[in-house]
Amino acid sequence: MKKLGRVPDGGGKRFAPGFKETGVGPRSKRPLGIDCMHVAIDDHSRLAYVEALNDEKGVTTAGFLKRALAFYLAKGVTVKRILTDNGTNYRSQVFADVTREHGIRLKRTRPYRPQTNGKAERFNRILQSKWAYSRRFNSNAERLAELPDYLDYYNYTRQHGGIGEATPASRL
């Protein structure tokens, strides 16, 4: 799960001339909030599933997991294990119930050791540099509207060095 600050209407300060403050942000009187980018990556194929949700609560994460499992099942992927960090949303009872309900073994990374979950961490970095901050967006809705197109590119067109220059979809 990666948190991204929302883009204000009219565009954010990242691409503004002189990197000028726009008057919105965490310390302003009108904060915009964040989008919680919930991410699932298939270990073998690197097929990615992402949703932008409003929070990272256990109930929200469990709902995301159900939708991610349906996505992977539709692609012919059988999920046997899930590797997560130790966030409270992944340690919640409702999240554990969903994994048990689907017969999935839940494994957690060592605390303060993000390298253990390297594929997801690397995907988060790619998502930031190639989609979220790749160009100026005029609003948060515009940025989120481009997410499905970027995921299609990532899953079906982009070649991955870690899997022999293949696309994730070709490894299913």
Enumerate the predicted regions with their spans.
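Active-site beta-loop-alpha junctions of metal-dependent nucleic acid enzymes
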Residues: 20, 27, 33-37, 51-75
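Basic, flexible linker segments flanking DNA-binding modules
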Residues: 1-16, 88, 96-98, 111-114, ...
